[in-house]
């Protein structure tokens, strides 16, 4: 592989469930590496596990990728649609002697492994049907279909320079002759992956370190095919805040749980980018910056820790930066589910502009914004406490001011201060009952901003109920 070889990366999930956080990070790093070099990002669906693969899982993976904006350049390619190609390669390997038929039954193989375990040996296929010079093979059993095994080298080592973990060496004696086609002819995982990586000219395989043990097997198959080897990089796992492997008990692990919980895709991408990669002290950056900066040299070897509070902080940053009209489109359906009344109500983007500074999620923003979209129901005891006889004359004067004041925050603020000065009141003495009357709540943004957004007609009507 030369410096001029076009970079080709791939994301190759098995559709046996949702797109999880670890898979999304793998996809992001593979996508970013291709983008950094102007290369090609391939999406491949490894669906040969017929018992566990489902169309629903395929759709969930594609939806997760689309939500994150990780658009593939080629694919999606489905392994189940490449069966003719796999059969062709298996036939070539059988003809070349790099694969062979094995007629050992599953019961015989299991008994073989039990004997090896009892002897303290590593369980492995013993090569009964492996052709060797001068070796006489057993008679072929009647009515038994064979599997096809890869003829793994018996001597030497498999060594590769992992871009994350450094040099890794596995002795071929640790590897047995892998089944590459089952009795029904369907090819197996490691074989399909090797053929696909070769056919698709993948130059860099970035994946989780749970695949490290697959790598020497795939390398040996690729060598047997005379294929060029890709570079491999195995990412350490993602841990929960407690140091255990990230799982459902830590909260959401499916990527598509996050939009439902009110996270923006750009926040999720930014957060995932920092799970196992760094660029100095930069915490917040755009995907354009990320793809410009991203390289494999700064991937960390130690497991990354998923910190929900850090994700909340980043999400808050992006909510504050986001266009209010876009946010309105995202939270309006949530608010409708909460019973929001939008007729004769304040402009939602304007409300969002007032409320979004401190919220961590869109769900929180939707709940907070409901202040402006439901009928107030102030607590009677709080009204008695705050709407006192001493305050009512000031409230009446404020109403008169509201009837004629120029409707804007500055003018409303000046009018309120004039009333306070006239009646020798402090701001909370009038602002608290106003908040209760107008919104039903004691905690709101500044009363001037609240009054401005509700508008003259609504504010006067609500105050009139209490004078």
From Swiss-Prot:
Keyword field: Aminoacyl-tRNA synthetase, ATP-binding, Cytoplasm, Ligase, Nucleotide-binding, Protein biosynthesis
Motif ('KMSKS' region): 245-249
BP GO annotations: glutamyl-tRNA aminoacylation
This enzyme's EC code(s): 6.1.1.17
Residue ranges annotated as motif 'HIGH' region: 13-23
Disulphide bridges: none
Reactions the enzyme catalyzes: tRNA(Glu) + L-glutamate + ATP = L-glutamyl-tRNA(Glu) + AMP + diphosphate
Compartment(s) of residence: Cytoplasm
Top-level class of the enzyme under EC nomenclature: ligase
Pfam families: Anticodon_2, tRNA-synt_1c
One Gene Ontology CC term in the entry: cytosol
Source species, domain of life: Bacteria
Binding of ATP, residues: 248
Family: Belongs to the class-I aminoacyl-tRNA synthetase family. Glutamate--tRNA ligase type 1 subfamily.
Role this protein plays: Catalyzes the attachment of glutamate to tRNA(Glu) in a two-step reaction: glutamate is first activated by ATP to form Glu-AMP and then transferred to the acceptor end of tRNA(Glu).
Protein name per UniProt: Glutamate--tRNA ligase
């Amino acid at each position: 592989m030369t410096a001029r070889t076009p970079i080709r990366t791939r994301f190759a999930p098995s559709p046996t469930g949702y797109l999880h956080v670890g898979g999304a990070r793998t996809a992001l790093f593979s996508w970013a590496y291709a983008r950094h070099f102007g290369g090609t990002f391939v999406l491949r669906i490894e669906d040969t596990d017929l018992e566990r693969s489902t169309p629903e899982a395929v759709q969930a993976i594609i939806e997760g990728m689309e939500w994150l904006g990780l658009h593939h350049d080629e694919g999606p390619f489905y392994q189940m649609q490449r069966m003719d190609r796999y059969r062709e390669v298996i036939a070539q390997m059988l003809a070349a002697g790099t694969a062979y038929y094995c007629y050992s039954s599953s019961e015989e193989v299991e008994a073989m492994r039990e004997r090896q375990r009892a002897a303290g040996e590593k369980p492995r296929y013993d090569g009964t049907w492996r052709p060797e010079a001068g070796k006489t093979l057993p008679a072929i059993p009647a009515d038994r279909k064979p599997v096809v095994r890869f003829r793994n080298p018996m001597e030497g080592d498999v060594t590769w320079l992992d871009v994350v973990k450094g040099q890794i060496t596995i002795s071929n004696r640790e590897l047995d002759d892998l089944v590459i086609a089952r009795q029904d002819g369907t090819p197996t995982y490691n074989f399909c992956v090797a053929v696909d990586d070769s056919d698709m000219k993948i130059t860099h395989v970035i994946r989780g370190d749970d695949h490290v043990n697959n790598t020497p097997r795939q390398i040996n198959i690729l060598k047997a095919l005379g294929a060029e080897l890709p570079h491999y990089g195995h990412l350490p796992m993602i841990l929960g805040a407690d140091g255990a492997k990230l799982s459902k008990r830590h909260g959401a692990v499916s990527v598509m749980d996050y939009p439902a919980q009110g996270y923006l895709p750009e926040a999720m991408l930014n957060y995932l980018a920092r799970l196992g990669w760094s660029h100095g002290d930069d915490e917040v950056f755009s995907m354009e910056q990320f793809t410009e900066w991203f390289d494999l040299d700064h991937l960390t070897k130690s497991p990354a820790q998923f910190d929900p509070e850090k994700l909340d902080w980043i999400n808050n940053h992006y909510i504050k930066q986001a266009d209010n009209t876009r946010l309105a489109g995202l939270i309006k359906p949530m608010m409708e589910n909460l019973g929001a009344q939008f007729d004769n109500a304040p402009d939602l983007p304007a409300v969002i502009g007032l409320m979004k500074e401190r919220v961590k999620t869109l769900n929180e923003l939707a709940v907070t914004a409901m202040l402006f979209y439901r009928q107030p129901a102030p607590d009677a005891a709080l009204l008695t406490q705050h709407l006192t006889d001493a305050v009512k004359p000031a409230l009446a004067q404020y109403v008169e001011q509201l009837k004629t004041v120029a409707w804007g925050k500055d003018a409303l603020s000046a009018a309120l201060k004039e009333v306070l000065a006239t009646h020798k009141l402090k701001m909370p003495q009038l602002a608290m009952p106003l908040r209760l009357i107008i919104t039903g709540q004691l905690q709101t943004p500044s009363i001037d901003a609240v009054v401005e957004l509700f508008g003259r007609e609504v504010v006067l009507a609500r105050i009139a109920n209490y004078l």
